[in-house]
Each structure stands twice: as structure tokens, then as C-alpha cells.
């Protein structure tokens, strides 16, 4: 992978709806199906901005969703989503707050407004690294995103904030 070789990506992800109800990739969703043949469904994604191939991401799985929004300095509403395995759903609030603070800080400090319509985080227990900063679709090991007030230490909350901010920037 060479960061000086940039491409725009348009991707259609097709999978069995029952096993993989969530189909994600970089960019903005541009089309989707109800049902495809043989119990399959599909979603098409388009990332209109050139990026190196190593920042391409694709996720298919049975994941739960925490959803919120962020209003940019120009008034655009960005859809924020965190996808996790069902048992981890109640531990994502701090990660969502950390993401919103990171977006605001980037705007206030550098005047940089997020340029897609959606920003997603996926956190799964079996991701083999800490995190990956795929544009618009950050992928994390759950240990970097999950923190709950009654079980996590201050250090765990700080780590979530630091990792979410680092991958967003």
C-alpha cells in the first residue's frame, strides 16, 4: 500500500441477511435492497474522496447499534453510529461522547469539518489489533471502546477517549 496512490471507492456488499444483517463500508450509503435472491441483501457505499487502499474497510456481521448525531460548525447533521456485539451495547456511551468531543475539537482547533454524511465505529471482541483509522468506518477491538461507569476505571475511560480521538483524527 502506498499512501501517495489514491483512489475513490464504490462498493456493494452482498450477504445472507440472517447471518450478516449489518453491511458496512467506507463513505456514504447510496443504495440498498430489501431482499435479494436466496435470502441475501445488499448495501452500496460510495466514498467520494480519494484515499489510499489501506484505508478501505468492509464489515459484515450481526451487530447492535448505538446511534446519535453531530451538528457541524456549518450546520450539517452527521449521523454517528457505533456497532458492537450485543453483549457490549450498554458500554458504548462514553465512546460516543468521546467521538463527538473529538469532532468538535477538530473543528474548533483546525477549522476542519467532517466531510461525509455518516461516521461509524465498529468494535468487536475478536479484532486482532487495537484499532484502525479507516476513514468513516473506524474498526476497534472492543477493549478500546467499552467503558461503563460502574465497572471501568478512570484510566479505562481515558484510554477510550484517547483511542477514539486518535483514530478519528
PLM features: residue spans?
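Short active-site segment of divalent metal-dependent hydrolases/proteases
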Residues: 169
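Hydrophobic helix-coil surface modules that form long, contiguous segments used
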Residues: 1-165
Amino acid at each position: 500500500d502506498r499512501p501517495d496512490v489514491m483512489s475513490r471507492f464504490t462498493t456493494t456488499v452482498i450477504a445472507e441477511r440472517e447471518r450478516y444483517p449489518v453491511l458496512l463500508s467506507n463513505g456514504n450509503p447510496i443504495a440498498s435492497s430489501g431482499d435479494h435472491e436466496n435470502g441475501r441483501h445488499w448495501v452500496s457505499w460510495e466514498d467520494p474522496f480519494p484515499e489510499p487502499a489501506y484505508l478501505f474497510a468492509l464489515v459484515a456481521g450481526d451487530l447492535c447499534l448505538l446511534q446519535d448525531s453531530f451538528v457541524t460548525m456549518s450546520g450539517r447533521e452527521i449521523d454517528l453510529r457505533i456497532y458492537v456485539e450485543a453483549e457490549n451495547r450498554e458500554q458504548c456511551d462514553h465512546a460516543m461522547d468521546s467521538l463527538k468531543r473529538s469532532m468538535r475539537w477538530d473543528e474548533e482547533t483546525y477549522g476542519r469539518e467532517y466531510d461525509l454524511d455518516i461516521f461509524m465505529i465498529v468494535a468487536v471482541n475478536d479484532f486482532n489489533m487495537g484499532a484502525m483509522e479507516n476513514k468513516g468506518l473506524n474498526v476497534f477491538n472492543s477493549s478500546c471502546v467499552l467503558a461503563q461507569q460502574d465497572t471501568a476505571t478512570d484510566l479505562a475511560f481515558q484510554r477510550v477517549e484517547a483511542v477514539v480521538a486518535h483514530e478519528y483524527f
